Amino acid sequence: MQAVALPTAGLSTHTGGLGTPAKLSNPGYGPAALAHYQRLGLRFDCIYSGYLADPTQAKLVEQAFELWPRALKVVDPVLGDGGRLYKGLGADMVPAMYNLCSKANLIVPNVTEAALLLGDPLPGVGSSEQAAEQAARLTRIAPQVVVTGVTGLSDGRCIGCVGAARGGQGYSVKTPLIPRMYHGTGDIFGAVLVGRILQGNVPQAAVQAAAAFVSECIRQTPEGTDERLGVWLEAALPKLMQQ
């Protein structure tokens, strides 16, 4: 499996708790890169988008979807967490992300992002019942949905995800709750999810693998580690590679 990165914005740090990051934007690069890939005759099995800094970048991803219509289209609609938009994102990102999600095969919002896409009141903590209901409604936007960061599973002892498919059965995946919150775990989850699907796993099995790996990353990270700096991803990679 070979990944081709298409940078949308360069940030000196992420936007959570590290002050105001320096931002590098090159709006001409993305369209030029896509045109170059097309001239080369490249074929992509999947197009997966994450953090997008402004609505024009959502349009760039839509352009990629149109150029490679047979690719699996996965969108992590990075908008916010903890009941609010991420710092640096304007309210105009919500309709832009909604439109992008409507062109995807699979979307992976957290409970806050699910509420933003649906126009629901922003949640503090997402219950499993609320997440299941939101996931089902989100299948009107995209045919496959996974809502992450769902608490309240097993009387609060677990955290997990709720999945739904248009016209299909819903499901939930849970892992033991470790009471620590690290930045970047959503990106790790999405990367493993997409990788497992491309290896031929059905979405529920891919979600299970991704959730288990994130849990392992947190377990491998010593308590007291600055949560803003993320998990010790490398320590958990051998177990993922053995699966």
Residues of each region from the PLM?
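Charged C-terminal helix
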Residues: 204-243
